[in-house]
Amino acid sequence: MNFCSKNAQMYYIPVGLTSLQKDLIEILLCMHAESFLEEFGPSEAVMQSAAQIKTEKEPEAVEGLGLGPLTPTQMNTMLLRHLRAVANHPCLLVDHYMPRKFLLMEPGEELIAMSEKFRVLNQMMEAILSRRRRQRPLQLVLVSHSVKELDLIEGFMLGKMVKIKRLSGTSLFDEKHQYTERGTAAAESNSTLTSGSTLKDTSPGSVEGKLSSGEAGAGYTTGGIKDDYDYQNSRRHMRAADDGAERQCDHEDWLFLATTTHLTHCTDLFDQYDVDVVLSLDPLLDVSLPALRSVRKQSKSVPLVKLFVQDSAEHFMLTRGISAEHEEDHIYDAVGHFIKNRGVHRQRLGMSAAALAEVVTALLENCEAATDLKSTKPTDTPSELSIVDALSERIMLLKLNHTPYELPLQRGPFSMKSYQLQLKQLIYARLEACQREQECKCAYILDRRMQETANLNRLDEVNAEAGRLFQSLKDEEKLVVDSERRLERTRDEHDRLREKSAHLRRRKAELEELLASSDLDSRVSSKRARLAELRQQLMPLEQQNTAMADSNEELRTRYQTRSSHAATLSSALASLRERKAALTKESTGPATCWMAASATEEHDRLQTELNDLVQQRHFLQKYIDTMKSQYAITNLDELNRTQHNKSGAATSRVRTTRATSPTYI
């Protein structure tokens, strides 16, 4: 597999770091800062950083462990190895192997959540495995740094729709998968379909069983088959054979797990496998290894996907073309680049989901490579930033808001045991600080929840009180409205009584005036005369009013009669309109149209037939006239009658005996 050729495909996927990985990296840097500056930095830099180093134990305690101190070169080599392990997965920082039961019982989501590289790998595997299953199954190779990393990968890959085969190390759980080559599997499937022995139903009640036992033949048999048709070639039988072959076909993908060391020492590792895609968690994987070149014989191009942490030491060496064999010669530049640029991981989220989906699509469709090293180049380091300042600051350390925590630079020298002990203590202290921070945040959240609950309770009380006040206000408004209505009625009654009182006062004044006057009789007489005059004027008015009342009654009666007649006509008109609408709908409906079309066609047919009969009559009339003129026929009716009598006499029968059958003469 030549990834440098024209048909080769190289994919470079940068990833970020999780909070746990960033904290562990800061702990490692504070452990190795002194040794890193002691080997690569100037002496004044060491003196400058010595003021910031906190002494936590005496040299006598280190010597009491019984092991010699580690040299700065060994410490820096360990730093590079540990940074690489943490960048892959935090669990790889442990020197011993993970227990098999722990990896089998640990939820895969927790293993994935610890590492950003594992999260991206899981997204890619989910996208690959969730594609259309009708396609050709893929054979994937996953290359890692170590066997421990393969154990973690197998731990969260178990249970997925893929067959896992460990090429390096011991499998956590042997699923007993047997690998067969694609050509061999296809040949076996074809031979199965050709022979048909595995798909035939040879039971005595089946057609195949009767045919095989000789019960079915050309003639009638006991089984009831009367023909010589070969039922093995029926459509139902062939469809059942196709379904059985499809079920026997292997649609599950294969995942082969190997390490870089195994690839280096085993040149024929992939000779018996038809590899489609190579996924490498080791960005420094040498593509010129014989194990990878052995796949070059294939006609197809096998893409290689490399996952690396952005601005890591491996990213630096990858862009500079430094191989894994010469990484110790460039350890200062690589680790120094990561130390100075590790702060950019606070804003970097790695490759977006859309870009990752494009990469997976390109892998499945065998398209051109979408990523290269130019698009994922390392971050430019500021020239004014010194390595001492970069080591002194805890840039990537997650800030704790409620728990005091400091991570000072650690002083050496360290032996192997003291180094592991100190590293474990720092990790444990950080874990305790994070747990206290979590407890403080949980307490803060619970306190806020209690406050919000109290606020909601007070709000409910305020709402209830507002409801009561609103109800009382409505009741008072109702009382006010009733009072206003009673006041209005009282005012109306008061005005009416006041007018009545004023009228009575006027009448009283008039009566008093009449009683006090001296000419009472003359005034009474004048009033009576006026009353008689008014009565005389009232009589014609009453007669006129009576006549108008009679006229109004007559007009009212006439109006009622005409209104009733108009209502009757209106109802009749409405019914006629409904009838018209129904008839219109019926006339324009499909049944009426069809009947009208049929009647029209029948009329046309009858008219054509009538025309034909008229023409035939004219023809016969002309023919008769012609025959009369040719043969001098004068009376056709007499001729017809004579012929009819002759024919009747010829076919008459006479009964001469008592026999039951007549005798014809």
From Swiss-Prot:
**Lineage top rank: taxon:** Eukaryota
Q: Does the keyword Repressor apply?
A: yes
Which keywords annotate this record? Chromatin regulator, Coiled coil, Nucleus, Repressor, Transcription, Transcription regulation
Q: Which InterPro entries match?
A: HDA1_su2/3_sf (IPR038609), Hda2/3 (IPR021006)
**One term under GO cellular component:** cytosol
Q: Where in the cell is it found?
A: Nucleus
- Indicate, by first and last residue, each region the UniProt record lists as having compositional bias (Low complexity): 647-665
Question: Which parts of the sequence are annotated with region: Disordered?
Answer: 181-219, 644-665
Polar residues composition bias: which ranges? 187-205
An individual GO BP term: chromatin organization
Q: Name one GO molecular function term.
A: histone deacetylase activity
Residue runs in coiled coils: 457-625
Q: What is its main location?
A: nucleus
> What family does the entry list?
Belongs to the HDA2/3 family. HDA2 subfamily.
Q: How does it assemble?
A: Probable component of some histone deacetylase complex.
Protein name, as recorded: HDA1 complex subunit 2
Species name: Eremothecium gossypii (strain ATCC 10895 / CBS 109.51 / FGSC 9923 / NRRL Y-1056)
Name of the gene: HDA2
